[in-house]
Amino acid sequence: MSDIPGPETSSYNDSQAEISDMLVVSELGVKSQNKTILEEVSFKVKKGTSLAIVGPNGGGKTTLFRALLNLIPYTGMIKWNDEVRMGYVPQSLVSTDLPISVEEFLRFKCKTDFDSCIKSVGLENDILRQSLKSLSGGELQRVLIAWAIVDNPTVLLFDEPTSGVDIGAEEPIYDKVNSLKKEIGITILLISHNMHVVMHYADYVLALDKKVLFFGDRKSLTHSQLLSIIYGNEFALSEEEFHKE
């Protein structure tokens, strides 16, 4: 596995890493202007599994992604498997006013065997011909997923992939993400505020509020228990109320 140390790397035992691990994070810490953003964050992600990262606003979820992408300084250890090839799906493009079609946008990245690239992500010809700025929120997210996976990544990082997307368009996006995991074994890390999505699509859950509140198998939690862990008991629905939604 490959080490991506922070500027102040703490002690780390290599025996913690196994060949089946895509990612091992140990004692991760991030500070900004002497303010603690993340503290003593440790978890593992197995190859071919999905991890949902949840927590209150300001809890450090996006900061964690920035550290995993080596975009900010941190302490502790981030250890990726040697096979790692990362794809990143942001909440949105910085600008959707680019005067180009979806096909031109994707060809910029997929320079060989374009037809195979497009087939793998399931984009229809009518979407390929549209301009980026004409796309709906759901269509744009599908294009961003396509952009992320045309290089055959082994890991995909999703930062609120359905933020700003109509409710009816959310499920097809997550179905596509789930199929990538099942069909080609991509490891998925997903930031989401949507507990319904977390409880239906994630294998494991990491709840963050600067520190780790919970890390474990999603099946070990009910929806109500997860809400209680993150927000306190007053926000937890009963299981009956949840299933009525």
What positions do the PLM features span?
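Catalytic Walker B motif of ABC-type/P-loop ATPase nucleotide-binding domains
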Residues: 156-159
